A protein has these predicted regions:
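Nucleotide-activated chemistry modules centered on ATP-dependent adenylation/adenylyltransferase
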Residues: 1-11, 16-245
Length: 245
């Protein structure tokens, strides 16, 4: 990607998959004992609904690497009118796609490396490792390039871009085993911690300004951990006392 693309970047949210991807990138550009210098920036699309611990972890990792961080804010897209939500507490997961395209256009990125995996959902299962997008940022399954062994075609016309998923064929078990083997640091909410929650529709819902306790609910402080670090509005923890992967 770095050899063939003019302006690549790596998507880094602070989640476990992007942590693994960043670790692989660091290994790829490690020269002896010298500090790693990544020849591309890190990109994060901030929905404004992230857990504070994850944003803090993201910033700490960027500072340790002395890397450049480009942040696209969904709030900016809302202010411009390119994203319209019914109410403030609506999930912003889908809205991220608009902000991502705007961030790509504003910075002229022609390739974005991401930590998506085929086993996560059906839509991702169909994507190639090098996933071609047209000048409108659209993915057309009929327009994808053949991928023979380790041979990939990264050629693009002006305005087109590539999404690259180096760990596409990894499973979630692979991710956790790699994190354990390499002793990779993760946001603390991946491990057991005390958190105020309410029991709602079979879920443990964190009590936050975005997800407040309802009048008929009773909150409790439990030992919990998160399996994923998505938005506050759509990510709930599970009861756990586990302090390791």
């Amino acid at each position: 990607v770095v050899a063939e693309c003019e302006n690549p970047a790596l998507l880094f949210s602070g989640g476990k998959d992007s942590v693994v991807l960043l670790a692989l990138a660091r290994k790829a550009f490690q020269l002896g004992d010298r500090p790693v210098h990544l020849p591309f920036p890190l990109v994060h699309i901030d929905t404004g609904h992230n857990y504070p611990e994850v944003i803090q972890f993201r910033d700490e990792q960027v500072a340790k690497l002395n890397a450049r961080l480009v942040v696209g804010h969904v709030e900016d897209s809302i202010a411009k009118g390119t994203v319209v939500l019914r109410k403030e507490t609506d999930s912003r997961n889908a809205a991220q796609a608009v902000t991502l395209l705007e961030t790509i256009a504003e910075n002229g990125f022609d390739a974005l490396m991401g930590g998506a995996r085929r086993d996560e959902e059906k839509a991702r299962a169909k994507e190639r490792i090098f996933s071609f997008r047209d000048e409108f940022g659209q993915w057309d399954p009929k327009a994808q390039r053949p991928e023979l062994w380790s041979l990939y075609n990264a050629k693009l016309h002006k305005g087109e871009n590539m999404r690259v998923f180096p760990i596409s064929n990894w499973t979630e078990l692979d991710i956790w085993q790699y994190i354990t083997r390499e002793n990779l640091e993760l946001p603390p909410i991946y491990y057991s911690h005390k958190r105020e929650v309410v029991r709602r529709k079979g879920l443990l819902v964190p009590v936050t300004p975005l997800t407040p306790k309802l009048p008929n609910e009773v909150s409790e402080v439990l030992d919990v951990r998160f399996r994923t670090v998505g938005d506050i509005s759509c990510t709930c923890p599970v009861a756990s006392t586990a302090s390791t992967p």
